[in-house]
């Protein structure tokens, strides 16, 4: 067995049927999203808050999907979801994520000029937006590390390859 620290425990295939263990980081992320939208501190969130909390975690649920999810987990029939119910819901949703699609979503955030590649300029912009104080040299090293074809930019396949090496996906 390998260490779970930093390694994703999400299944690599789409919608693997077995129960998935979340990393501590994922649990924390889910807890923060829940707390953020439990504005009255009741320990529960309603359908509208559930939708916003899921959006904060990178999901885009439809109204009908929200209704069905609440019906599935709302054992006490209150019409709202407590943290344990939300956690079990999000554990299932995270297991259904397609890692390749998640990586490509991230790629598109970097590639804001839609060239199909991540340039030095793209990387620098994202670094600034995230408040990372990286030097130009460090940013260039990141590009050099991922750039397999030597064109000075990172294409989708190069990005997917480097992201898979990180064990985040």
Swiss-Prot record:
Subcellular location: Cytoplasm, Cytoskeleton, Microtubule organizing center, Centrosome
Record annotation: effect of changing residue 79 to A: Abolishes Ca(2+) binding to EF-hand 2 domain
Effect seen on changing residue 152 to A: No effect on Ca(2+) binding
Entry-linked InterPro entries: CALM/Myosin/TropC-like (IPR050230), EF-hand-dom_pair (IPR011992), EF_Hand_1_Ca_BS (IPR018247), EF_hand_dom (IPR002048), RNA-helicase_DEAD-box_CS (IPR000629)
Molecular functions per Gene Ontology: calcium ion binding; NAD(P)H oxidase H2O2-forming activity
Alphabetically ordered keywords of this record: Calcium, Cytoplasm, Cytoskeleton, Metal-binding, Repeat
Binding locations of Ca(2+) 1: 38, 40, 42, 44, 49
Superkingdom of this protein's organism: Eukaryota
Stretches for region Essential for homooligomerization: 1-21
Positions with a binding annotation for Ca(2+) 2: 74, 76, 78, 80, 85
Binding partners and assembly: Monomer. Homooligomerizes in a Ca(2+)-dependent manner. Interaction via the C-terminus with other proteins disrupts and/or prevents homooligomerization. Interacts with SFI1.
PANTHER family from the UniProt entry: EF-HAND SUPERFAMILY PROTEIN, MYOSIN LIGHT CHAIN 1, 3
Similarity remark: Belongs to the centrin family.
Protein name, entry field: Centrin-1
Organism (species): Toxoplasma gondii (strain ATCC 50611 / Me49)
Lineage of the species this protein comes from: Eukaryota, Sar, Alveolata, Apicomplexa, Conoidasida
